[in-house]
């Protein structure tokens, strides 16, 4: 039986018909304790989902749908290393990277032992650099770490580093290079000293075009200063699942850190792919980062579905995507330190859930995934919240608020007020009675107020979740990221798709090689469609190779 034919799914269709014409204002008016009932705390996070177009029966039916998809079994497979891809290879075992309590996994002991060894290696390097004992080619201590990678090899470490900057030990600084455009590289290193700069090359296969090209640029940049190749070897580390290729590139074997094939790039920040972060904040704080994620792992495995934060977050997304036909979801963090979180979550969601084939190879017959995007509040209030408030689409929003940036900082009350004000407005709207009352109180005549009111109405009934971190620290950040990882995994289980591959992106890379040959050597263009052929000819014309 397919997902859409299951009894809970059919019941959800009827529930949608019942609720689609109701307004959330009425839910709150009828239930004064709704905000209390539809909220929970876990792993250092507070989650309010009361401003959603659901009642308790909806939640029950969504949970039944999850059970019908064997979610309990699939959760245990995630934590036991029993998930495999279409080739039978283990995937999705990133949860092992943050198993910090007695290492109690029942299977894959070899993997756990390798993880422990990796931890020790990361810890030792972090201590050496932070204490100034790791030297460059002129015997100066390292001050700048440059992470070269792309996708998950860059987005995760950069996001986490920026979020945890108060924990970075001066004078250490981290920088991140990902783009094939050489501007990214040269603008990053422009103010750096080659004598005190360490490059970390992160690539699972060590064949990624963008990463290797930037690694080559790094080699040339260092050689201009050091003059001799043997002198720059201490300035390179590699994180990869292909150590032999990293060694062929010129990385010393002792400077190569393991990244296992069963860890996807977008789930790799917990591994040595987070080496730059571990160096910057120190091993103890990095371990707190892992502990926070593990706390959310434990909650995810143990809590009942209707009290389970990742599962509820996923089921609500399913509700809006598959029944309200929402095409997009927004993530709005109210903390400057979380500026890169929307980009990170965009990749996590869209690369994992952008699939149209089920696990058995058959076509999907229901919507999967959505466009996930966002920006910082309050900046976003002055750019695109207008679409949320007075547009015509259903756009679920996740608001993420931080009460205090650190133990020493002040409460972020103005930010919190804006965050809560946005969520309340999205829910209740601004009806004509309220608009007229406010306009008349401003001294505007009734007739003019009537005309103005039409343009100021806000229908409301737009869903949102609010997630609150008491403090933004390594533990709470780890918990927050694991929350969204598990949310995405639950969605993939219900849609019966594989969240651990991304074959779609490979085709464009392959075609880029052919097009580059045409641009460089004027090879036969008959294999290209007429549009691509015309674009190639235009580039060649401007370049001066064609009349």
Curated annotation (Swiss-Prot):
Pathway(s) annotated for this protein in UniProt: Carbohydrate biosynthesis; gluconeogenesis; Carbohydrate degradation; glycolysis; D-glyceraldehyde 3-phosphate and glycerone phosphate from D-glucose: step 2/4
Catalytic activity: alpha-D-glucose 6-phosphate = beta-D-fructose 6-phosphate
A GO molecular-function descriptor: monosaccharide binding
SUPFAM superfamilies: SIS domain
Keywords in alphabetical order: Cytoplasm, Gluconeogenesis, Glycolysis, Isomerase
InterPro entries noted in UniProt: G6P_Isomerase, G6P_Isomerase_C, Phosphoglucose_isomerase_CS, SIS_dom_sf, SIS_PGI_1, SIS_PGI_2
Top-level division of the source organism's lineage: Bacteria
GO biological process terms held by the UniProt record: gluconeogenesis; glucose 6-phosphate metabolic process; glycolytic process
GO CC list: cytosol
Cellular localisation: Cytoplasm
Pfam families the record matches: PGI
Active site: 351 (proton donor), 382, 509
EC number: 5.3.1.9
Family: Belongs to the GPI family.
HAMAP family per UniProt: G6P_isomerase
Summary of the function given for this chain in its UniProt record: Catalyzes the reversible isomerization of glucose-6-phosphate to fructose-6-phosphate.
Annotated protein name in UniProt: Glucose-6-phosphate isomerase
Gene from which the chain derives: pgi
